[in-house]
A protein has these predicted regions:
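Exported/periplasmic ABC-transporter solute-binding proteins
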Residues: 4, 22-266
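Sec-dependent N-terminal signal peptides of Gram-positive bacterial secreted proteins and lipoproteins
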Residues: 2-23
Length: 266
């Protein structure tokens, strides 16, 4: 019995001093882009399986995630847009994790299969208001988009040159809500992360180009944006957060990132 107890005690001592035991390491908190849910979920799960360190994710949207980093309420912010000058002036740093296409989605019943960027812009600014104007059915186009502060919205409006001019019927707070709404309305059109699109909606080609890893990587699919990790330049990450950051920005994470449907930056 004494021998068993001493072995158990020795094991506890070894565990407390070994890098292989992670019970005392704090969790890593991430906050931000709802479009990055899938890739952060995959990376967080892989990292936790390898290290035992938990990664939490708060899907608040890009703008809120950036604010959370600035306020010191999370370790790593997640943004599906580049940092603005005023955000950089707050001492925030952007590291590109991956590139993601923004899919233009319609209801599966919609006969439209391809739109060019100019036509998409005319639709969202109200210049084209009925599907029949571009070869579809006689139905008013229902414009679905994201809320102000969304990285996906920022990227979409920047690429289509429609900032502050979109005539949204609904401005929704998550990628999932956009997909669900378009799936439920035959006259709707929306935009969402390619990595998040489900079979309940149809992705149209843009200028004849289908969004894919290859077309996003070579730039031929033009409706794309970066997935960005946001940190504070003058604030050191915790040991756990630094370990997670180093892993997800390394070549080791490339396969996991690719499995989430986005293109790794490294």
């Amino acid at each position: 019995m004494k021998k068993i107890i001493s072995i158990f005690a020795a094991a506890l001592i070894m565990c407390s001093t070994s890098a292989g035991c992670y019970s005392e390491k704090e969790a890593v908190s991430t906050d931000g882009s709802t479009s990055m849910e899938k890739v952060i979920g995959v990376l967080g799960e892989t990292f936790e399986n390898d290290t035992g360190i938990t990664v939490t994710y708060n899907p608040t949207g890009s703008g809120s995630g950036i604010k959370a980093v600035a306020a010191g309420t999370c370790d790593i912010g997640l943004s599906s847009r580049d940092l603005k000058d005023e955000e950089k002036e707050q001492g925030l740093t952007a590291t590109i994790l991956a590139y993601d296409g923004i899919a233009i989605i319609v209801n599966p019943e919609n006969p439209i299969n391809d739109l060019d960027v100019e036509t998409i812009a005319k639709i969202y600014t109200g210049e084209i208001a009925n599907w029949s104007e571009i070869g579809g059915v006689n139905a008013e186009i229902v414009l679905i988009g994201r809320e102000a502060g969304s990285g996906t919205r920022d990227g979409f409006e920047s690429i289509t040159d429609t900032e502050d001019n979109c005539k949204y019927r609904q401005e929704l707070t998550s990628t999932g809500d956009v997909i669900t709404t378009v799936a439920g309305n035959p006259a709707a059109i929306g935009y969402a992360s390619v990595a998040s699109v489900k079979d309940s909606v149809k992705m149209v080609t843009v200028g004849g180009i289908t969004p894919s890893e290859e077309t996003i990587k070579d730039g031929s699919y033009v409706v794309q944006r970066p997935f960005v990790l946001v940190t504070k330049a003058d604030t050191e990450l915790s040991e756990s957060a630094q370990e997670f950051f180093d892993y997800i920005t390394s070549e080791k994470a490339r396969e996991a990132i690719s499995s989430a449907g986005v293109v790794a930056a490294n």
